[in-house]
Amino acid sequence: MKPRILLLIATSGLALAQPDEPISDAPAPEPRELAPQDRPDAERLETPPANVSGAVLARLNAEFLTDDEQADLRVQHGQWTDEDLADPVRLANSLAIAHAWAHPALTEENAASAEQAKLSRAEAALNRGEAENAIDFTAESGLVRAHQIRGRAHELLGDTESAIAAYERASSFDAETPDEPEAVRAALALFRLRAPDNAEQANRALLERITRARDADRLNYNARLVEAELLYARHNLADAQAAAREALRLNPRAAGAWRLIGDIAVDSFDFDTAESIADQLDQLASTAREASVLAKAVSADAAALRARAALRRRDPDGAETALNPALGAYPDRHELRALDAAASAASYRVTSTERLLAEFDERSPGLPDALVWVGRTLAEARQYDLADGYLLRAIERAPNWSMPRLERGLMLVQAGRDRDARSELEQALALDPFDIRAQNSLKLVTELATYETIETEHFVVRYLDGIDAALAPEMAVALEAMHDRVCSDLPGGVDFEPATRTIIELMPNHEWFAVRIGGMPSIHTMAASTGPVIAIESPQEGPKFTVGPFDWKRVLQHEYTHTVNLARTRNRVIHWMTEANAVFNEDAPRDMRTWTLLANAYQNDGLFDLQEINTAFVRPEKPSDRALAYNQGAWMFAYIVERWGPEMPRTIMDLSAAGRSATEAFEQALGDTPESFLASFKPWARSQLTEQGLLLPEGTPSVPDLLAEALQALGADQDPDQIQDPGALPPEGLIDELLERFPDHAPLLEYKIAFALVNAEVRLTDEQLGLLVRMTELRPPDDAPHRRLARHYLAGDDFDERLRAIPHLEFLDAREINSPAYAAELAELYAKSDRPQRAQAKAERASSIAPFSATLREQAARYALLAGDLDAAERHLVALIIIEPDRPIHQRRLDALIRGQAG
């Protein structure tokens, strides 16, 4: 019944005419999370279908093929049967395709000894980290695949000279060989180990070889896969994914293609798809295993994917949990050991990290991979100085590999060291001119060098000269007020000042904002703090912008709280608390959607304790978990401030910065365990929900209980056929009777309002008005009655009647993030009621949310003049000249204002 009533309420009104944008009494659209620090909205990938292409099926069913030829082709295209795998060579090859590296057929001494089978065993040994065995298995083979495997084995052993020699032999084979994809892999590997005389020419030659390999056999999945690997190495994620999908259409069991798409999913923050692909890789790792040992199959690829995803979510414990079983099965696999070191670094265990790096070096001396992973992970955790040290060590080890230089360049961009970043990115591109991420980032820092700057005491605002010049000066002024608020010792204040000016970069469109934050134009939020730098997308309308106008002051105050918190704690802060602090410092009332989310969690025993809330951020079990963690965190922050005082959150975060876990910090500061904190929080939470009308007072029966009682009484007096269907709307008369008994029962009042507003006119009756006003008293955060009341009063013929909309518009405006409509209407009402200062304040807010609206700028200038604020009027006229340079009226008005001031 409840959804039906809400639908009646939601659809009971029409929009109000407003300048620029209408006010609606329909429910507000769900607001975008202001600053998802660790997971910008994911670029969702579709899990590839596991069916083979029609062309492959036609090849497999060709009548001229012998049985053995058909069986070989079935293995080549991932369509093998149990009967096919009775042959030891086909079994070995199928296991290599599926990356089932630990299968007995690839590990036991008496396994198949045919050349191709031995090469599959060599590849398996290589992927288990057994480089010497891989070399032994390939000793008698002169095939391209053998040379390529030997090259990587020597690389893992730290024998760069032998690795180069093996890769050269593999890549020198004629392009007509069926093993051309392996030759391309070898040529690609050479880029890591030595600098070509002409990098651009060498890259083009590599692309030509891939094209030839693809053209030589259109159904060779390996040709598509190596193409995907090259594109992925160049950070061309879209084309890499397309090529990997093509490979899967030619061989649905190609674990290498699945793994690559999984890596792209992690890079795109699409952790659901990454997990789905990890499950697929787990299944492939069980290829040809007996049912009794299926549970023992461990996929190294799946473990690496899950660990990578956990590290991106800043969940080092989750990464280690994912890695441990795989490290048990593959203790020498270099990738797993590198990720293990990265997970240790993400937990700030310096001694452990160095030990793991030393163990990695014992197995693979001179290999830079672990250093790159550690540096990259620390950079994402905003530990820029530590990251720099590891990445410099990686560059020293692999001066010809572009990856460490690229990662360092990207880290320097995030740290705001643009000059150093530019130098590093230029060197990365000299080694690999086709890397898209490096190209994007270098283009960014080159463009940033041309930006205009405004310096204040605590900030440097950078912006592209043009239309953003209308906003940047206002932003600079507002930021200093934010500094005073955020750095204060007031509730929510961090009581700390960063040592250097914070750089605010006003990015001219979403694409450049995304490149600024992540090096690729595929991040879906509008502001983010990297610590010393806050990037924010210009709040403009159009296809190049994600959200259009938004309350950038609120957003920046949120982000600056992150920046100051990170500075105070040296970037070591309890995840949920820094988010909670940032939301608290938005200084905006909690809206109805948030209250409803919290109430549902409370009623369903779904509130998180201190351990669960961090897990909900990094490993959400339900789609709503992260939103709940975000909002419950801010709620708990308010509770801590109210109960222990404004200093307590800072004490807890300082303990975290000193190395305490979240649980330890709370126990030391508050004397609370996760369980006892939640136990003490819940009564406070209930009192808040009751106060806000989201929960009924203790002892008050719910609507279902009241209706059940009424229906039971009805059934005692009437025939069963006359008893109303419990799923139908109750009679209005029954609701009236119940409201007489329980006049403060907000859910009952919802029913009454729904009945009263069916077919209601824009102008309401006194009875309808009384019901809506009563709802504002019983359920203070509910925006629906305020929307309906505002529409009613604004439709009045009498001006004094229209003025009665003001408190309802103020309520709505205080909770609005994206629309200037409420503030603009309030400005008009205040101006016409001779309250010029209030009119100016609301016109300023409207023009702040939509700073490029000429209509709102004109309104703001007009009311600034009305309030006698000539400086503000001049500022808006200057902005109008920038926004509408083809309208000379703005310049004439500005000239007149200046003359008037001079006179």
For each predicted feature, which ranges?
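Juxtacatalytic substrate-recognition/specificity segment
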Residues: 204, 208-212, 242-243, 284, ...
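Alpha-solenoid helical repeat scaffolds
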Residues: 116-123, 145-152, 180-189, 222-226, ...
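Residue-level detector of the short coil/turn that links helix A to helix B
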Residues: 99, 129, 158, 198-201, ...
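Single-residue signature of alpha-solenoid repeat helices
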Residues: 134, 163, 202, 206, ...
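Beta/coil-rich, acidic/histidine-enriched accessory regions frequently appended to metallopeptidases
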Residues: 20-75, 79-100, 123, 277-280, ...
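Short coil turns that delineate tetratricopeptide repeat
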Residues: 112, 141, 175, 218, ...
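Zn2+-dependent metallopeptidase catalytic core
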Residues: 40-41, 45-81, 96-103, 194, ...
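Amphipathic alpha-helical substructures
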Residues: 351-355, 414, 419-422, 573, ...
